[in-house]
Structure formats: C-alpha cells, structure tokens
Amino acid sequence: SSRPYGQRAVLKFGAHTGATPVAGRYTPGTFTNQIQAAFREPRILIVTDPRSDHQPVTEASYVNIPVIALCNSDSPLRHVDIAIPCNNKSIHSIGLMWWMLSREVLRLRGAISRDVTWEIMVDLYFFRDPEEAEKEEQEARDRAVAVKEEPAQPYAEQWGSDPVAVPAGGQPVGVPDVTDWAADANKVAGAPAPPQQQWANDASKVAAPAAAPAAFPSEDWGSVDAPAAPVAPAAAAPAAAAPSQDWSTDDWGGAATNDWAVSS
C-alpha cells in the first residue's frame, strides 16, 4: 500500500499472517529486476487501491502473479484478478477490510476457530496520526502521574492556636458539624466557655486616681508658658482724689493725680 491510510493495516496484516508487507513507496522492478536487492517473487499480491498501486499491479501481470485489490466503484480493474468491493477511501473502512482479511486467512489455516471471537481488536488496523498518537500518550502519562500524587490534607485555620488536621470529609477532628448558627456558641461540644466579665464589680475595684506628678522643667522652652511672677501685697496707697468729670479740663500732659511710680 502506497497510501498512508493503508500502511498501518498492511503492516498489521503481515505481522498476523506472516506475509511480507510493502508499506510506502514501491520500488519499480521489485518483481521483474532480479539484480536488485529488493527483488521479490510473491505467490499473490494484495493491494489497497489499484489506482495508486498501479506499478506493482502492472509488474505482477508480467510475471503471472495473481492480484487481489480493494476496489471502489471508480477503481480501474485492469490486471486485477479478484476485486473486493469496499470503500477504499475511508480510514476505518480500509482498516476493517484488512482486519477481516487477516481473520479469514487465519481461519483458513486453522489457526483460529470460527466459533471463537478473534482476540485482536479492529482498532489496531486503523490509521493513526503520529501527532495525535503522541498527544494521547502524553495525556495518558499525565493522568498516571496525577493518580500517583496524593492530594494534600486540608487543615482548618485557627488564629491563635495550632492548626487542626482536617480529614478527607472536610470536618475537623473533634469538632461537631454545626447546622444552627443561631444557637449558643457555648453549647458546642469541645468549645470552652468564655470568661464571665462583671463590669459592675470591676468598677468598684478601680483605685482612686493618684496625685498628679510634680511638674518638671521641659527642655522645649517654646512649648511651656513662663511661670507667673509672685505678687507681693500692695502697700496702702493714699486716697486719691476723684477724677474730674470735666474731660475738657483734664491735663493730658502729666497733671493726673495717680502716682504711677509707687513701687510694689
């Protein structure tokens, strides 16, 4: 088979029946040129498509080799001895026809019984794209690695205490499942009761505020007010005469009766 879709099926047919497969490009002169290394003298020739494999079919007619071909409705039948009608353009159809042909050859040889199902799956004869096959193998390896890796055990985060291990079910060990969130938190098993705070009793225990500490001089002179100067008792001043009510006659030049020079 020179067609890529039939090469895998031809190789499987040769492996199961012992025939000599020729997959890929056919070397001209394989059946007629005896001096080349690839010379063959087959007893029968089976081709996937007589149109694409016209060279071996023509050479087989020169040396009287019977030809069996998988023929479609538009396939040429020149030099074809036995035509097997099928769809030779479909990947699955080509693989199925070669699988059935392999099974029939083994049954005629007596290698397998007709009453027993053949253990070889037909999928082995189907063409597989190398890129898709490599992608499937990579996905299978990734799945195998993912199965081997054990998932990490989750844990419940509790602030201020050690983490509590959580089993696969998701509920921490020793902590019951709480469904009623409106219930009293103290009733939950395993939870300590919070301390009772008596604000009325604590208020009576508050000590009286201590005396204000003595003020110390501050190093920041700009932020502290200067202390007030001590005030000495004023000496008895002589009775001053009542100021005159006549503002027009007051002497603003220093004739006032107030003595501003009295020292304190």
Curated annotation (Swiss-Prot):
Which key words are in the record?
Cytoplasm, Ribonucleoprotein, Ribosomal protein
Could you give a single Gene Ontology term from the biological process aspect? cytoplasmic translation
User: Which Pfam families does the record cross-reference, listed alphabetically?
Assistant: Ribosomal_S2 (PF00318)
GO terms under cellular component: cytosolic small ribosomal subunit
Q: Which SUPFAM superfamilies match?
A: Ribosomal protein S2 (SSF52313)
Skewed-composition ranges (Low complexity): 162-176, 226-243
Q: Which InterPro entries match?
A: Ribosomal_uS2, Ribosomal_uS2_CS, Ribosomal_uS2_euk/arc, Ribosomal_uS2_flav_dom_sf
Q: Tell me one GO molecular function of this protein.
A: structural constituent of ribosome
> PANTHER family attached here?
40S RIBOSOMAL PROTEIN SA
What is known about what this protein does? Required for the assembly and/or stability of the 40S ribosomal subunit. Required for the processing of the 20S rRNA-precursor to mature 18S rRNA in a late step of the maturation of 40S ribosomal subunits.
* Protein name (record): Small ribosomal subunit protein uS2
Q: Which organism is it from?
A: Strongylocentrotus purpuratus
